[in-house]
């Protein structure tokens, strides 16, 4: 914490809870507990460069590669107010689909988690630079607002199928599953092998078809279940953990390896005090969660793919993995 006070762009730090205090129940999804805190702030212009600098994104932006020609899907819960937020220019919207029981209410009052993730990658204003502001976006609502059931995995699989049909390049997924309202459906760590869940199976098929899937690792690193969730366990995708702007791992970031011994997460990005746009009022905030690290990597992948338009999804994935400081 002391190191943060030395940063000129941080005006104040306020601890919202004791470090040992439990946050929520592990039985809820990543969507519901991805945000550990939301602390209003007023960062100086382009403070987002600090979180982009960690993986050397500014040179791509400076070279003119900001996601042009890349189509990105964002699969999540609600996208509250995203359709009227000035920082999210609608000229880069391809459309949206709602796979939940509520149908076509993705911009309604139930849930802003998806909108917050979207701002990390898409938003642009005088004081904010998303990771890939010139890419085009399609939104998928797959999370039921009031229940936790395997149906949500089926919703996500349907969204990935649509993403393939639409010719998208990348899908950013800030959700994950381990336990459900009905315990008989719960996963064990042994299930996190990239083969057992329908979500992991669909992710592998999508990768074979050319999609690059970016998935949040989960926020259970400091809980009894401290492993990744699914579909983050899938092979041939990029699972993203959370660090601070200095590269130090966030305590809540879920651990690997997968149950069959593969390295997970493959990469990390800034998910501690990530600068975002609050969809409720358009102000800048700082929030925590691998949910917010995930779209940053998706945006970086889009910019890299803009620079290397003939690359395959697996080539982009491999370049990103090789860029990691612990590769």
Where are these regions (language model features)?
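Subtilisin-like serine protease catalytic core
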Residues: 59-152, 166-169, 182, 208-210, ...
């Amino acid at each position: 914490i002391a190191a943060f006070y030395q940063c000129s762009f941080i005006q104040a730090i306020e601890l919202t809870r004791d470090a040992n205090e439990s946050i929520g129940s592990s039985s809820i999804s990543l969507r519901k507990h991805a945000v550990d805190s939301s602390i209003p702030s007023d960062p100086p212009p382009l403070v987002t460069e600090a979180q982009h600098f960690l993986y050397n994104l500014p040179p791509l932006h400076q070279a003119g590669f900001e996601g042009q020609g890349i189509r990105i899907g964002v699969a999540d819960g609600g996208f509250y107010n995203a359709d009227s937020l000035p920082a999210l220019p609608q000229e880069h919207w391809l459309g949206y689909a709602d796979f939940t029981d509520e149908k076509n209410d993705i911009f309604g009052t139930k849930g802003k988690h998806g909108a917050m993730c979207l701002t990390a990658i898409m938003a642009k204003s005088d004081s904010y630079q998303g990771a890939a502001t010139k890419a085009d976006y399609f939104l998928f609502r797959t999370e039921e607002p009031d229940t936790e059931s395997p149906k949500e995995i089926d919703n996500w699989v349907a969204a990935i199928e649509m993403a393939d049909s639409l010719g998208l390049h990348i899908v950013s997924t800030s959700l994950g599953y381990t336990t459900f309202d009905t315990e008989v459906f719960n996963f064990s760590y042994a299930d996190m092998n990239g083969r057992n869940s329908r979500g992991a199976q669909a992710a592998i098929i999508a990768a074979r078809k050319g999609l690059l899937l970016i998935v949040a690792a989960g926020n259970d690193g400091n809980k009894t279940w401290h492993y990744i969730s699914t579909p983050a366990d899938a092979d041939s995708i990029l699972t993203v953990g959370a660090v601070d702007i200095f590269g130090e791992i966030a305590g809540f970031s879920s651990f690997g390896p997968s149950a069959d011994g593969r390295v997970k997460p493959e990469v990390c990005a800034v998910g501690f005090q990530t600068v975002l746009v609050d969809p409720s009022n358009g102000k800048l905030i700082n929030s925590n969660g691998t949910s917010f690290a995930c779209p940053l990597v998706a945006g970086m992948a889009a910019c890299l793919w803009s620079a290397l338009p003939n690359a395959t999804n697996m080539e982009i994935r491999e370049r990103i993995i090789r860029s990691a400081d612990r590769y």
